[in-house]
Amino acid sequence: MIRQCRAGLRLCRALYQTSYRWHGKSACERALRYAPGESIHGFTVNEVTPVPELFLTAVKLSHDNTGAKYLHVAREDSNNLFSVQFRTTPLDSTGVPHILEHTVLCGSQKYPCRDPFFKMLNRSLSTFMNAFTASDYTMYPFSTQNAKDFQNLLSVYLDAVFFPCLRELDFWQEGWRLEHENPEDPNSPLIFKGIVFNEMKGAFTDNEKVFSQHLQNKLLPDHTYSVVSGGEPLNIPDLTWEQLKQFHATHYHPSNARFFTYGNLPLEIHLKQIHEDALSKFERIDPKTSVPPQERWQSPREYSISCGTDSFASDPEKQTTVSVNFLLSEITDTFEAFTLSLLSSLMVDGPNSPFYKALIEANLGTDFSPDTGFNNYTRETYFSIGLQGINKEDSEKVKAIINKTINEVAEHGIEAERIEALLHKLEIQMKHQSTSFGLTLASYVASCWNHEGDPVDLLKIGDKISRFRECLKENPKFLQDKVKQYFQVSQHRMTLSMSPDEQHYDKEAQLEAEKLTQKVKALSEEERKQIYEKGLELIRLQSKPQDASCLPALKVSDIEPKIPLTDLDITYAGDVPVQYCAQPTNGMVYFRAVSSLNTLPEELKPYVPLFCSVITKLGCGVYNYREQAQQMELTTGGMSVCPHIITDDSNLDTYEQGVVFSSLCLDRNLPDMMHLWSEIFNSPHFDDEERLRVLVRMSAQEMSNGIPDSGHVYASIRAGRTLTPAGELQELFSGMDQVKMIKRIAEMPEMGPILRKLSRIRKYVLLSDNMRCSVNATPQQMPVASKEIEHFLAGISRSKKERKSIRPHVVEKSSSPSSSGSEISRRATRKLVGDPTFKPCQMKTHFSLSFPVNYIGECVRTVPYTHPDYASLRILARIMTAKFLHGEIREKGGAYGGGAKLSFDGIFGFYSYRDPNSLSTLSTFQKAADWAKSGQFTQQDVDEAKLSVFSAVDSPIAPSDKGMNHFLHGISDEMKQKHREQLFAVTHSDLTNASNKYLTAGQCTRGTAILGPENRNIAKDPSWIIR
């Protein structure tokens, strides 16, 4: 990684000798040498501002000819990011900005090949590539650690957004079209097709999405926020190709653009390329895309909408959602918005907040309503508060509670200790280093900057915290005054309620059918003929091999041959192995521990995920659950627990099962954090039925709401269930089985039996037996951390008697980070369990859900991580996705997404997402295997697949996560280097051999699962299990 970056620096020096600021200086130092008024490649520097609390320097510029705005954030970070965003303000719900976002990425003047965006995924080492359509802007970001790659991607992105082809057939494919159900049969019925059309149909199966969309439309009804920028499925077929091209001409202009770059590459190089490749070809215009302020109401308003029923609701009679919404300040008033965001957090976050106490614990609903809290994605910010999972008759009660709570906060204010806890949380957020910090910043400033706000002022979080403290000091009722101003005096207040309608999806289907009939009836014979011919033309185009030679590409030789090594020190605290990893963590300490589940009785296993979810939220030691939450907020950045299932790296029938404990804190708070863990381990509370009931209902609601967004994940977990012993446990812990179990628990009248099961689990898990720990911190902090870990481990219990593993076949594997590790590190072992008698079997499951689209997973058992064929299968999955499945499933089939992947557990999986098809997609999966076996791909395709795989292998790792591959998965640097060498060595014949060996129908064991609407063909097939 370091060598790769240095190679990039040498390239930059060779190309741009004029970049004098680049030589021998840090990114921030170089940026500070710019002067306001200085001209650089057609741009003028407007402002240079150091922001020390975020270790960055911001340089604000504008383009002389076009007025394009530019923000460069210089930071010593090799994961460099580019983004360009346009203010896109549609006035109808045809989805024109969303369809345009898709279509500009389908080919451009310099790169006329079809789909350069997806092709660049395989010609680059990008760490991120995507595009987003928000309510009022469209953003195109990418990031990479390679300087040459940055220039390649920048060239493609600039040409895509400013000089796209916008071909009619691309509009048909990406947006919508009328096409015969079977495009080759003119007698088959005409239907609506299109990627965005199907994507939005899938999006609106999510009731939370439906609610959020209506909330914004109705609270801000005067301009662009009154429409669906992503597209309302019934309105999408009203968009014409001409309208799409016109929207591009008026909105995708440099005068309406905001450029953002981040990282340690020199600014001059970016400016030169952007000016020469794009901006020099334009003159300034007035884009007329500004959003006027919403006219404030004179009296509150109320609305009611309907949605689909939730088959996973814990109480079918309680499926109503109600919220009260308040329009707040302009987003460009950055301090006011900052203050209101803090006030919102204080009012709704955690069990000590007024609204949590008043609403969540009122036993009326399951969770807060969607969008609860502060929303700053529109020109004017807003606050939303409400409940979901309530009885419709309780709507008035909820509204009354909201009013009462607002009045109480206005009168009594917020406790000082809670304010300190929130400011502590902000301090941690500023110190914590993520690998995608550039993308985080680009997204953070996007909305405010979009409305002419100052993005640099937004970054000065330290200044805002100081000013906030000063305001509180000068006026102790500062926050109470804000509550009165925005929640009591203001009349711009909207109440929205949503209730299920059993006929909702039928009505949607009927309206779509009527729209279709209307469109078809209006067709002349000549137009019908053209539709048939265009359908055939689109298939020919989609099936035609693409020449992508016009696109820039890295070579496999650009990939660094060796991995950077991570120094790990493994010692013992008593008989517990502890991994120490010294890193520049910026004054933070990261603690993890793994506790084995090997001795846990089988009947308690299904309750492990619930145990993990609630163990840090029930109270412990001297703290009740409210006090515990307050202590966690005051002294930590969070404490979490989750199940841990890791398949062995050399045997698919062996796996580690456990629970992972994770937390982080500032250096100064390490003793307090470890004290909290001691209290949780030694004295957890399992005596509050009402508290558990609240947590279970929230968990059940969250799982149910997550299915429309993660349906393909649930399908894939289910499909892999019968292929390995770990797969069975994965389904139990994270699959549809867990969703249904939590739903059943939420329906139970008494929580006592569940509390007793959780208390029993504690006796097997919250012990130092079969535990290992890890710490990531600065070298200076390590001696203190070591003492605290030793003190913690010495103070927690051990089993009073030796417990045997429930599964008799136990495998001990060394935890040493290298074969030449110290004697102490070689003592450390991980205890895995195996089932030598396990026999994988085939199973096909269909979960019949009231969705208009399908989520599909098909899995094949292959080989473990260290097997020589694992590298071939990993590259095979990428080549099948890029060269076959993307075209068949997305372009031809109209699904939002689909592909193949190889997971660490040796499961080769096919999947599709928001897919209008079901059984035909399963046929496509088999065709993909046949295509791979036939070897219909080139050496160039193999090299591109390697680039794509290495972009994931070499993705940046934050200081907090260094060494985690070894600690959690048992993967050492030596093993990673060997795998790397195997990836480099994969040949064309290796891929065809792997396809024949592992993907041949009848020779491999497969699991299949579909989540989606009723299917008559599946219902008639006895080989399917229908749930």
UniProtKB/Swiss-Prot annotation:
Q: Tell me the GO BP annotations in alphabetical order.
A: proteolysis
State the source organism's domain of life.
Answer: Eukaryota
Keywords on record: Disulfide bond, Hydrolase, Metal-binding, Metalloprotease, Mitochondrion, Protease, Transit peptide, Zinc
In short, the EC number is: 3.4.24.-
User: Which InterPro entries would you find in this protein's record?
Assistant: Metalloenz_LuxS/M16, Pept_M16_N, Peptidase_M16_C, Peptidase_M16C_assoc, PreP_C
Give the cofactor binding note. Binds 1 zinc ion per subunit.
Task: Extract the ranges annotated as region (Disordered).
Answer: 800-829
Query: Which residues constitute the organelle targeting sequence?
Result: 1-22
**How might one describe the regulation of this protein's activity?**
Mainly exists in a closed and catalytically competent conformation but a closed-to-open switch allows substrate entry into the catalytic chamber. Substrate binding induces closure and dimerization. A disulfide bond may lock the enzyme in a closed conformation preventing substrate entry into the catalytic chamber, participating in redox regulation of the enzyme. Inhibited by metal-chelating agents. Inhibited by nickel and zinc excess, and slightly activated by manganese.
Provide any one GO MF term from the record: metalloendopeptidase activity
Query: Which SUPFAM superfamilies has this protein been placed in?
Result: LuxS/MPP-like metallohydrolase (SSF63411)
Q: According to the UniProt record, which cysteines are disulfide-bonded?
A: 113-550
Q: Where is the active site?
A: 101 (proton acceptor)
**Positions with a binding annotation for Zn(2+):** 98, 102, 199
* Gene Ontology cellular-component terms listed: mitochondrial matrix
Q: What does the UniProt record tell us about how this protein is modified after translation?
A: A disulfide bond locks the enzyme in the closed conformation preventing substrate entry into the catalytic chamber.
Q: Where in the cell is it found?
A: Mitochondrion matrix
Pfam families attached here? M16C_assoc (PF08367), Peptidase_M16 (PF00675), Peptidase_M16_C (PF05193), PreP_C (PF22516)
Q: Where is the composition biased (Low complexity)?
A: 814-823
Cofactors needed by this protein, per the record, are:
Zn(2+)
Establish whether keyword Mitochondrion is in the entry: yes
- Report the main location listed first in the record: mitochondrion
Which family would the database say this protein is a member of?
Answer: Belongs to the peptidase M16 family. PreP subfamily.
Assembly and binders: Monomer and homodimer; homodimerization is induced by binding of the substrate.
**Function summary:** Metalloendopeptidase of the mitochondrial matrix that functions in peptide cleavage and degradation rather than in protein processing. Has an ATP-independent activity. Specifically cleaves peptides in the range of 5 to 65 residues. Shows a preference for cleavage after small polar residues and before basic residues, but without any positional preference. Degrades the transit peptides of mitochondrial proteins after their cleavage. Also degrades other unstructured peptides.
Q: What is this protein called?
A: Presequence protease, mitochondrial
Source species of the chain? Xenopus tropicalis
